[in-house]
C-alpha cells in the first residue's frame, strides 16, 4: 500500500482528543500475591516496583485467612502485604484490596456465599478487614472474578452477587467512609452484561475488568483484539448507564511468557506490554491498569499461570519490566491529544503531551509488513528530537533526510521512520509536524516454518 497524504487531508484526518480525564491521576501498577501465599521477596519487589514508576498495587486478604475459626476474626499480619500497603500508601499510591472467596464453614461446597448466614459472615469479615486497612486502601473490591466458575456466569448468579453487594457495601462504607467500592472483575463481555443487568452500578464507584485475550488463540490474542474488546465493553456499559461512561479499572491484564499453547516469547510479551500502555489512555473511561502480575509465581516454563510476571521469581527483570519503567511516566502523567489517522487501521500514531513536550507513539499491527512514514516539520526553527523504541535508550536526531534508495535530493525539514510492532517514540517540539507519506511493504518477522532452526 502506498499513498500520499496532503496537508489538507492530513489536517482533516486528525481525531480530536477526549476531554474530561478527571482530577484523579491515572493508576498504573501490578498485582501481588503477598496477602495469601506471601510469595516473593517483598523488598526486592517493592524496590523494582518503585523504580518502574508504578503507583497502584492490588492484593487480597481472603476470608478463610482472616476468620481462621468460625466466628473468630483475626488479622494475622504476615509482614509481607502490610509492608507493601504501607509503602504504597506512604508514596501516595493506590492500593486495591480484594475481599474474596468462599469460606467452607459458611458456604460448604458452594463457591459463593448465598445463604443469609453466609452473607452475614462475609459482611462481618469485610467490615473487619476494611477497618484494618482504613485510610490506606483506596478501594475495597468485593470479590475477584465471581463469574470464573461453572454456573457463575449466568444472570441469576450475578443477581446473587448484587444481593451480596447490597448487604456488604453499607458495612464497608461505615468501617471506612473514605474508601471506594469496586465491583467484582468481569472477564468477558457477555458476563459484564449480566453483571450490569443485575444492577451492579447502583452499589459501586468503579467497575473492574479482566479483559484477557491471551487464551483466545493466534490472531485473536493480540493488543489489537484487546482494544476491540474494550470498545465493546464500553458500549455495553453505556447501554446500562443511560448512554454515559462509568469509571473502569483494568485490575488484571497480561500475556504469559511461557512454553505453552497459549504462551508467548518474552519479546512478544514486551511488545504487547508496550502497545497496551501506549493505547490505554485513548480509552477515557479507563482510570487505571494493573498488569497481572508483578512477579512470576514459580519457575515452571510449561505453566502459563506461573509466567505472567514483569520480573522472574528471583526478581530478575524481564524485557516487559523495562517497557513499563520506560512508559510509566507517559501513561501516568501524559495527556492524550489525538490519534493521527494514517489511512490504515493497523498503523497507529498517537499524539501525547508530556511535561511541555509532544510525544508520538507509533507502531503497526501488521504481522508481516513494515510501514515507513515520512514526517515534515514546517516550523521556522526545527529543534532536534528524541527517538527510542519502548524500553530502549533514546537517540537524538536532527531534522533532514535523503531518500538515497530512490535517489532523491535531501529534504531539510523531513524525517522518515520504519514502524514495526514495538512502539517507536518520538519526543520534542512537534507542533508544526505533519504526516506526509506512508508506505507499507512486505517484510516477514519470522522465518518460514520449513527454514526455522
Region annotations inferred by a language model:
Residues 255-325, 339-345:
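Aromatic/acidic polysaccharide-binding cleft in carbohydrate-active enzymes
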Residues 401-453:
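C-terminal beta-strand-rich structural cap/linker in extracellular carbohydrate-active enzymes
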Residues 342-390:
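Carbohydrate-binding surface patches
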Residues 52-214:
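Substrate-binding cleft and catalytic face of glycoside hydrolase catalytic domains
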Residues 22-62:
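Boundary/entry segment of secreted carbohydrate-active catalytic domains
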Residues 57, 129, 140, 168, ...:
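Conserved, mostly hydrophobic/aromatic
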Residues 1-9:
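Bacterial N-terminal signal peptides that target proteins for export
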Amino acid at each position: 500500500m502506498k499513498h500520499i497524504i496532503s496537508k489538507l487531508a492530513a489536517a482533516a484526518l486528525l481525531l480530536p482528543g477526549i476531554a474530561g480525564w478527571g482530577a484523579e491521576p491515572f493508576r498504573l501498577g501490578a498485582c501481588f500475591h503477598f496477602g495469601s501465599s506471601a510469595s516473593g521477596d517483598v523488598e526486592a519487589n517493592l524496590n523494582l516496583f518503585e523504580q518502574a514508576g508504578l503507583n497502584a498495587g492490588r492484593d487480597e486478604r481472603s476470608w478463610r485467612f482472616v476468620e481462621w475459626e468460625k466466628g473468630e476474626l483475626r488479622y494475622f499480619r504476615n509482614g509481607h502485604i502490610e509492608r507493601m500497603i504501607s509503602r504504597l500508601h506512604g508514596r501516595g499510591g493506590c492500593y486495591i484490596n480484594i475481599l474474596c472467596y468462599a469460606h467452607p464453614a459458611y458456604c460448604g461446597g458452594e463457591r459463593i456465599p448465598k445463604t443469609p448466614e453466609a452473607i452475614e459472615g462475609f459482611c462481618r469479615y469485610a467490615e473487619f478487614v476494611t477497618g484494618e486497612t482504613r485510610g490506606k486502601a483506596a478501594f475495597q473490591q468485593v470479590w475477584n472474578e465471581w463469574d470464573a466458575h461453572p454456573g457463575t456466569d449466568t444472570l441469576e448468579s450475578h443477581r446473587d452477587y448484587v444481593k451480596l453487594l447490597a448487604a456488604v457495601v453499607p458495612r464497608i462504607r461505615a468501617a471506612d467512609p473514605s474508601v471506594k467500592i469496586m465491583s467484582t472483575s468481569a472477564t468477558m463481555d457477555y458476563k459484564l452484561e449480566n453483571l450490569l443487568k443485575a444492577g451492579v452500578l447502583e452499589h459501586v464507584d468503579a467497575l473492574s475488568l479482566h479483559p484477557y485475550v491471551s487464551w483466545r488463540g493466534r490472531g485473536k490474542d493480540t493488543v489489537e483484539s484487546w482494544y476491540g474488546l474494550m470498545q465493546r465493553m464500553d458500549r455495553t456499559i453505556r447501554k446500562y448507564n443511560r448512554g454515559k461512561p462509568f469509571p473502569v479499572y483494568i485490575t488484571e491484564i497480561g500475556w504469559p511468557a511461557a512454553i505453552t499453547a497459549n504462551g508467548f516469547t518474552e519479546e512478544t510479551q514486551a511488545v504487547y506490554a508496550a502497545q497496551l500502555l501506549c493505547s490505554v489512555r485513548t480509552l477515557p473511561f479507563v482510570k487505571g491498569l494493573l498488569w497481572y502480575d508483578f512477579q512470576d509465581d514459580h519457575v515452571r516454563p510449561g505453566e502459563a499461570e506461573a509466567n505472567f510476571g514483569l520480573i522472574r521469581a528471583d526478581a530478575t527483570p524481564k524485557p516487559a519490566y523495562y517497557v513499563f519503567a520506560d512508559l510509566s511516566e507517559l501513561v501516568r502523567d501524559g495527556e492524550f491529544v489525538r490519534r493521527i489517522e494514517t489511512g490504515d487501521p493497523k498503523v497507529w500514531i498517537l499524539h501525547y503531551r508530556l511535561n511541555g513536550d509532544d510525544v508520538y507513539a507509533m507502531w503497526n499491527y501488521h504481522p508481516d509488513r513494515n510501514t515507513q512514514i515520512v514526517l515534515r516539520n514546517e516550523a521556522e526553527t526545527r529543534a532536534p528530537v528524541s527517538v527510542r523504541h519502548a524500553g530502549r535508550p533514546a537517540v537524538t536526531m536532527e531534522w533532514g533526510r535523503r531518500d538515497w534508495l530512490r535517489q532523491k535530493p535531501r529534504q531539510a525539514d523531513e524525517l522518515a521512520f520504519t514502524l514495526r510492532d514495538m512502539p517507536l517514540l518520538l519526543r520534542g517540539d512537534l507542533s508544526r509536524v505533519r504526516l506526509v507519506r506512508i508506505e507499507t511493504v512486505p517484510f516477514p518477522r519470522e522465518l518460514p516454518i520449513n527454514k526455522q532452526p
